[in-house]
Amino acid sequence: MLRINRISNLRTFGQRFFSTEQQDVVVIGGGPGGYVAGIKAGQLGMKVTVVEKRGKLGGTCLNVGCIPSKALLNASHLYEEATTKMSKYGVKCSGVELDLGAMMQYKDKSVSGLTSGIEGLFKKNKVKYDKGFGKITGPNTVEVTLNDGSVKTIETKNIVIATGSEVTSLPNVNIDEESIISSTGALALKSVPKKLIVIGGGVIGLELGSVWSRLGSETTVVEFTNRIAAGADGEVAKKFQKSLEKQHMKFHLETKVTSVVKKSDGKVTVTVEQVGAGGFTGTLEADAVLVSVGRRPNTSGLGLESVGIPTDKAGRVEVGDHFNTKVPSIFAIGDAIRGPMLAHKAEEEGIAIIEQIHNGGGHVNYGAIPSIIYTHPEVAWVGKTEEELQKEGIQYNIGRFPFVANSRAKTNDDVEGFVKFLAAKDSDRVLGAHIMGTNAGELIGECVLAMEYGASCEDIARTCHGHPTLSEAVKEAAMDAYDKPIHM
C-alpha cells in the first residue's frame, strides 16, 4: 500500500510540474477577443489552446458586463412600459409588481446559455480550453496554473494576450459590492435602492443607472466633466441628457467626488465639490453608490517583464500596427492594448491577429468601430463628431432627420430622437453618423457598413429601404446631407 501511495504521489507531482503540450497558438484570456481568436485559429486548422482563469468563457462582457446588463435593460424597460404606458394601447395591466428575484434569474439564464454555447463552438472547432491562470515564462512557453491547483507548461509558436480589463475605483474608495458597488455589484443587487448615486456619466453608469431608475430608484449621476456620454457628438449628448432627465434621472456635471463614506446603518454619504461653472458642492446621501469611473487592463502577473514586453502607465501592452509586441512571437489584443474597451473591437482584433499569424493578413478599421449606449432611447455613433471635425479643420455638411417624422416610429409611439450624418463637403463621403432613438444600436450597422466601404450620403439615400421601417430615418438623414429629405 505504501509503495502504491508513493507511485501515486510521484505521478501527481509529475502532472503538477512537468506536463507539457505543443501548440501553434496559445490565447491567454477567454473573453470576446480571446475566444473569437481561438475559434478562428481552429477554423484555420491551427492547434490552439485558450486559457481562461474565470472558469467560464465570455469574459467580463458575457458574465458581468454587456450581456447581463442588456438583459436587465430589457426587463426593466418592459416593467416600466407595463406600469406607465400599456393602458393607452388598450392593454390594461392591473396589479403589476416587480419580482426582482425572477428578473435576476432571467438575466442569469441569458448568460449561462451563451457561455455554454461558446464551449460548444470550441468543441466544434477543436479548440482546447484550459480553466486556469496563464503566465508567460518565455517567448514560446506559457505556464498554466489550473483551477484545480495543478500546473502545466504549454510550448507554442505564438502567444496572444487577450486578458481584458477590470473595474477601477477612485482613490480611497473601497468597493465592497454591498453599498458601494461596481458594475458587477449593480447587476446583482438583492433589492431596489431607494436612492442610488452613480459616479461617472459614461456608458456603464448611464445604462445601469437607467435600469435601477426604471425599477424605482431615485438616481443621481455625478460626472467630473461638463457632459455625459464621452465620445458621443455634443449635440446628441445634450439631447440625451434631457431625455434621461425626463425619466427622472438627476445630473451633477463638473462635479468632483472627494469622499465616499459608508455609515453604520449601511447608507452612504458622498461629498462632492464644484470643478466648473455648472458644478455642485455639498453632500449626497444614498442607499447605494455605483462607482463607474473606468476600467484598467488585466496585465499584471502575466510575466511580461520576464520577456521584456513593456506596458504604458495605464498598464496597456505596447503593440505595433499588427498587434505585435517587442517579442516576435507574442501579440496582444482587446482591452489589454490601446483603443476603446469594446467587446466588438476586441472580436475584430481576435480575427485579425489570427489571420495575421496565419498568412500575414488581418486588418481592423478603427475609424469604423461603433459605440452604443443601450438606454431608452438608445444612443449610437460611428466615425467623427462635429467637435472632432472642427478641431481638424475639415469642412462638412450635416444631414438630420427626426424620428417624429418616421412612420414606423409613430406607429410604435416612440418618436424621440433623430439620425444625424456628417459628410465631407467636397465628396459627400460619410465621415460620421450619430443616432439617438429606439434601436439606434441596430440602425448604426448600416452606417458602419457605409463608412467601411467609403460610401457617400447619396449612396445611402439612393438605396431602397423598406417601408415602414425605422431605417428610413437613416435614408432621409442621408438625403438631407446632400439634398432634401422627402418627409420633412
Curated annotation (Swiss-Prot):
GO molecular function: dihydrolipoyl dehydrogenase (NADH) activity; flavin adenine dinucleotide binding
Enzyme class: oxidoreductase
Cofactor: FAD
Residues the entry annotates as binding FAD: 52-61, 70, 134, 163-165, 335, 341-344
Keywords: Disulfide bond, FAD, Flavoprotein, Mitochondrion, NAD, Oxidoreductase, Redox-active center, Transit peptide
InterPro entries, per database record: Class-I_Pyr_Nuc-Dis_Oxidored (IPR050151), FAD/NAD-bd_sf (IPR036188), FAD/NAD-binding_dom (IPR023753), FAD/NAD-linked_Rdtase_dimer_sf (IPR016156), Lipoamide_DH (IPR006258), Pyr_nuc-diS_OxRdtase (IPR001100), Pyr_nucl-diS_OxRdtase_dimer (IPR004099), Pyr_OxRdtase_I_AS (IPR012999)
Pfam families cross-referenced by the UniProt entry: Pyr_redox_2, Pyr_redox_dim
Cell location: Mitochondrion matrix
One Gene Ontology term from the biological process aspect of the record: L-serine biosynthetic process
Binding-site positions, NAD(+): 200-207, 223, 257, 294
Reaction(s) the record says it catalyses: N(6)-[(R)-dihydrolipoyl]-L-lysyl-[protein] + NAD(+) = N(6)-[(R)-lipoyl]-L-lysyl-[protein] + NADH + H(+)
Keyword Oxidoreductase recorded: yes
Protein family (similarity comment): Belongs to the class-I pyridine nucleotide-disulfide oxidoreductase family.
PANTHER family associated with the record: DIHYDROLIPOYL DEHYDROGENASE, MITOCHONDRIAL, DISULFIDE OXIDOREDUCTASE
Protein name, entry field: Dihydrolipoyl dehydrogenase, mitochondrial
